[in-house]
Amino acid sequence: MLCAIYKTKRKEGMYLYIEKRGHFDSVPSSLLESFGKPIFVMLFNLAGQKSLINANNEDVQQQIKQNGFYLQMPKQQENLLEQERQYLKHNK
């Protein structure tokens, strides 16, 4: 299955996967509104040899078939300062 991948300027690491390039009919309007203007990144073969970096190819393919799209959320970044504060608080 070939899919089109789009990114947004609003949130680093957030990507929208749809079955056909430019066909956003199955994406809820509220999601498109919060996503902003989609910026095309590439076409990707989910059934091919290459794997997505931050998502499972089979999961993405299944979500696109069921819902018409897949939304990849950005990974949460570690807050090292907060971790250090918690460590110091509990190890006085």
Swiss-Prot record:
Q: Pfam families of this UniProt entry?
A: YcgL
Q: What is this protein called?
A: YcgL domain-containing protein HSM_1274
Q: Which HAMAP family match?
A: UPF0745
Lineage of producing organism: Bacteria, Pseudomonadati, Pseudomonadota, Gammaproteobacteria, Pasteurellales
Q: Identify the residues that the record assigns to the YcgL domain, covering every copy.
A: 1-85
